[in-house]
Amino acid sequence: MTTSPLANPTATRELLEEFGLATKHRLGQNFLIDNHVIERICELAELAGDERVLEVGPGCGTLTLALLQEAACVTSIEADPELEPVLDAHAADYANFRFIMDDALRVTPEQIEQAAGGEPTVFVANLPYNVAATIILQFFQTMPALKRAVVMVQKEVADRIAAVPGNKTYGGYTAKLGLYAQVTGRFEVPPRCFMPAPHVDSAVVRIDRVDGVVPEGLDREFVARVIDAAFAQRRKTIRNSMSANGFAKDVLDAAFEACGIAPTTRAETLDVAAFVCLARELSHDA
């Protein structure tokens, strides 16, 4: 059983007091204080001891200390400069821990690879909820060696990530993430597992990279552009939405026919394979 010495209110409070810190809601900081949740996160991550783990938003290092027991190395990205002394103290105790002080959305894959001593293979994090969805998609897009992610997010974000066609939460984000990966696990985390308790429910999701969704020679960025155009005017038919966002109607009609898609369909009913088919047909005229 993998646990963290900081995963209880007393230990977290004492550490914050030792370094003169208070929680900062502006950065979305709610510290995890439940070892049962940490154990389940580690089980879902299936770390075998040889992975380079990437973490975003380590906070005071509660999850980090658990990951360090199971990974070859852990590289964390933290935006709050006041937490640097805490992470420095952890780095002094663990030779396999490295960290970058910066906004995760600004750090380049090259910076991460340099800090980690190679490309990260697993992403495990209790993510800042305000940027969680963006970070997940960006990391899968820019880090090809990333095999899977196990991330704590707001329940509504987890619903978007795991949504299926026809579901009201299924949208352009879900379809674009589906070009790279799919959800393979999930569990809910109540507010009482954090300090301070957030005013929202949380969930942990496991997302595994899937190869071969987009065929060789078809640009994923173009597929994403097709998805964005299809969802741009969600209440309209896919033909009207896409024609208002850069695609000619006659070209669209030919692509719809080739893919067996009715022009009166709405984007939220189509799966990722349908968008890939559309993009393939439309790429001939791009």
Map each language-model feature to its residues:
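C-terminal lobe and adjacent flexible extensions of AdoMet/dcAdoMet transferase-like proteins
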Residues: R209, I227-A286
